[in-house]
Swiss-Prot record:
SUPFAM superfamilies: Urease, beta-subunit. It is found in: Cytoplasm. It is an enzyme of class 3 (hydrolase). It comes from the Bacteria. Pathway: Nitrogen metabolism; urea degradation; CO(2) and NH(3) from urea (urease route): step 1/1. This is Urease subunit beta. GO terms for molecular function: urease activity. GO terms for cellular component: urease complex.
Amino acid sequence: MIPGEYFISKGDIECNVDRKTTKIKVINTGDRPIQVGSHCHFFEINRMMSFDRSEAFGMRLNIAAGTAVRFEPGEEKEVELVAFSGARRAFGINNIVNGDTTLEINKQHSLAKLKTENFKNK
C-alpha cells in the first residue's frame, strides 16, 4: 500500500437511492454571488434567492457532500433537491425552522416567518 492510495470498487456509486427528490428553478435577485453548500437546508438559503420555498422544505441540494452550487447575480438555475434523512431536523442558517421538517405545522409556521423576515418566495 502506498500512503494516500485509493482502492476503488468496481461499478457505480449511487447516492440518495429511494429518497424523495424534486427540481426547482431558482433565481438570485441580489447583487452579490451566493454559494449554497451541499447540506444546507435549501428552504432557508439567502433571502434574495427567489423560488418556491414550500417545495424546498426539508430538502437540500442533491450534490456530493462538501460541494456547493454558486448563483451569480441575476442568474436563474434549475437545481435538484433531495429530502433530508435521519431525524430530518433543521437548525440554524437563518433561524426560520429550528426543528422537525416532517411536521406540516412547522412548515406552515416557517412559511409565515419567511414573510415577516422579507424572504423572496414564489
